[in-house]
């Protein structure tokens, strides 16, 4: 059960990072931390109950890798356009 406790702690750290950080890259890293906490939870439940949670965790990792590529591409494009990755600057809708 220490897997689930560690997973909950990592998820709480990720939520804290999303709520308190102001740069888009750190918010993005916090979201990735939350996804990894969910993966750890899947594997922890699989180990405790003899299920195949590893397969689901591998699928989540594959989707997260694609998300990282798209997300970092968007952050780089925003930085080139606005010269900043501050989340507060991104809330303004301009043409």
UniProtKB/Swiss-Prot annotation:
Transmembrane segment boundaries: 1-21, 25-45, 59-79
Record-stated family: Belongs to the complex I subunit 4L family.
Reactions accelerated catalytically: a quinone + NADH + 5 H(+)(in) = a quinol + NAD(+) + 4 H(+)(out)
Enzyme Commission number(s) of this protein: 7.1.1.-
Organism from which the protein derives: Thermus thermophilus (strain ATCC 27634 / DSM 579 / HB8)
Protein location: Cell inner membrane
Record's keyword terms, sorted: Cell inner membrane, Cell membrane, Membrane, NAD, Quinone, Translocase, Transmembrane, Transmembrane helix, Transport
HAMAP family recorded: NDH1_NuoK
Name under which the protein is recorded: NADH-quinone oxidoreductase subunit 11
MF GO annotations: NADH:ubiquinone reductase (non-electrogenic) activity; quinone binding
GO cellular component terms given for this protein: NADH dehydrogenase complex; plasma membrane
Membrane disposition: Multi-pass membrane protein
Function: NDH-1 shuttles electrons from NADH, via FMN and iron-sulfur (Fe-S) centers, to quinones in the respiratory chain. The immediate electron acceptor for the enzyme in this species is menaquinone. Couples the redox reaction to proton translocation (for every two electrons transferred, four hydrogen ions are translocated across the cytoplasmic membrane), and thus conserves the redox energy in a proton gradient required for the synthesis of ATP.
GO biological process entries: ATP synthesis coupled electron transport
Keyword NAD: yes
Self-association and partners: NDH-1 is composed of 15 different subunits, Nqo1 to Nqo15. The complex has a L-shaped structure, with the hydrophobic arm (subunits Nqo7, Nqo8 and Nqo10 to Nqo14) embedded in the membrane and the hydrophilic peripheral arm (subunits Nqo1 to Nqo6, Nqo9 and Nqo15) protruding into the bacterial cytoplasm. The hydrophilic domain contains all the redox centers.
Lineage top rank: taxon: Bacteria
Pfam families: Oxidored_q2
Cysteine pairs bridged by disulfides in the record: none
């Amino acid at each position: 059960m220490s897997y689930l406790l560690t997973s909950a702690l990592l998820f709480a750290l990720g939520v804290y990072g999303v709520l308190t950080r102001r740069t888009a890259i750190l918010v993005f890293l916090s979201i990735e931390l939350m996804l990894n906490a969910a993966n750890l939870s899947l594997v922890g439940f699989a180990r405790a109950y003899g299920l195949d949670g590893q397969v689901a965790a591998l699928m989540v990792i594959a989707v997260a890798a694609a998300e990282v590529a798209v997300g970092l591409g968007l952050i780089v494009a925003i930085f080139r356009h606005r010269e900043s990755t501050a989340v507060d600057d991104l809330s303004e809708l301009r043409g």
